[in-house]
């Protein structure tokens, strides 16, 4: 990949939100992400990982550039001196680059079940709605469909940010909004 990891730093960023920002970077770019905020002569950071990279082990490999660190496989925190930030960025990117294959930077999606387009009925959607609300303890179900092809597509909305389309197989089509 062009960039194996993302490390961003800022002056006096709110330490209470840098973990959220790191998570959003992972969601958007699917790269291990570290967000650092400067506090005097040190940087404190929040880290989030992707599947296949044990974040604590990655930070342990960079320990000579850090004041302290802690965490687990998918999330961690760290502290480093202001004058070590470039050394840390280089060491962390090198560690990620040597441990991850190009296909590791594509997110994997776990599906609940394979379904046929003919099974997508209003009654089925209403039945799924009974499982709401979705969240951490009750994730939104994801279904897979084989041999699905887009049939038509058109941008909609004031800024064209949504897509109205028909998808389906040769035998059955379903309207979809994205």
PLM features per residue range, with description:
Residues 1, 5, 27, 45-178:
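Acidic, two-metal ion nucleic-acid-processing modules in DNA metabolism proteins
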Residues 2-22:
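Flexible, glycine/threonine-enriched loop-and-boundary segments that flank and lead into catalytic domains
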Residues 21, 27-29, 34, 120:
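Extended beta-strand-rich architecture
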Residues 34-49:
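Short glycine-cluster motifs
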């Amino acid at each position: 990949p062009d960039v194996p990891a993302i490390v961003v730093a800022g002056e006096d960023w709110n330490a209470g939100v840098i973990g959220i920002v790191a998570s959003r970077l992972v969601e958007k770019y699917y790269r291990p992400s570290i967000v650092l905020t400067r506090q005097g002569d040190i940087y404190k950071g929040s880290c989030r990982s992707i599947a296949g990279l044990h974040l604590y082990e990655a930070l342990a490999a960079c320990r000579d550039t850090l004041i302290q660190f802690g965490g687990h496989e998918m999330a961690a925190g760290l502290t480093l001196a202001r004058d070590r930030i470039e050394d840390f960025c280089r060491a962390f990117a090198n560690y990620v680059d040597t441990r991850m294959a190009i296909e590791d930077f594509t997110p994997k999606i776990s599906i609940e079940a394979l379904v046929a387009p003919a099974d997508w009925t209003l009654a089925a959607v209403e039945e799924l709605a009974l499982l709401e609300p979705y969240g951490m303890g009750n994730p939104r179900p994801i279904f897979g469909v084989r041999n699905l092809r887009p049939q038509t597509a058109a941008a909609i909305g004031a800024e064209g940010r949504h897509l109205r389309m028909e998808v389906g197989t040769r035998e059955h089509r379903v309207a979809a909004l994205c």
